[in-house]
Amino acid sequence: ILFIATTILTAQHKAPTDWELSGLKGKVKSQRSIPYEVVTQGKTFVKGAIDRDLDTVVKIGNLDNLQKDFNPNGYLTQMRFFFKNDELYSRMEYYYNPQGQLFETRYNSDKTLYVYNPEGYLIKDATYSPGGFLKTHYNYQVDTNGKVLKEETYHANQLESTIAYTYNKQGDPVEMRYYDAQGNLLQRVESKFNKQHLAERNRTYDKDNKLVNITTKKYNSQGDCIKLQAENKLPQKQKNVATYEYKYDNQGNWIAKTTFINGEPRQIIERTLSYYE
């Protein structure tokens, strides 16, 4: 499921807020994001029409065209995705127990339930169809500090894949190993983090330990990515560089983001944020 709440690899009962996960400063009440095409005019460019949907045939909206709503504690209550014409594409709703733990999400007609161990760490989530049929579920093996050591993905109660995590002393996931249902290694990802716990480099290896891809990131002082370089080694060498320029509001949240691919402007995303007083 695309929009299940992001798996938290740190202590669940001290999970970061969705403000933090979204890189937002201040008490954000709502965030409305709209992507726009870029129109070049000689050596300059301007904002064009709202960017196209991902697929107009099977009707899949642009996932950058969305609104996030937060409760006063910084946790998501709703995410809505829109088509180019502003019609609703899909909706994700979040529900919390009195302790503040996420216990249920609803994506369109599907329902996902979340299970915690006595220490308050997430150990399972399961998604059901409207008729109550179990579609997928995830099992999380955690250590005494709540860090996810192993994540198992099941489809209709059949194991599909497993991810094993290794952490550094700072608690960052520095290695992820991906396995199929039979336990065969599919790929391995090594990650390097900065002092702000933001990923600076990912190196992806295939099952034969051959380097497939290197992705590097650079950030500005606000913690927003300003450069992403993806260098493919296999099956053929290829390198692409994305750079980003931002405009910020008084809270330090970006309200406009321009994306360049290999130096060419590709997209402008504008965000409107409202805040709790």
Predicted ranges, named:
Residues Q12-E277:
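Buried hydrophobic residues that stabilize the cores of well-folded domains
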Residues I1-A15:
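Bacterial Sec-dependent N-terminal signal peptides
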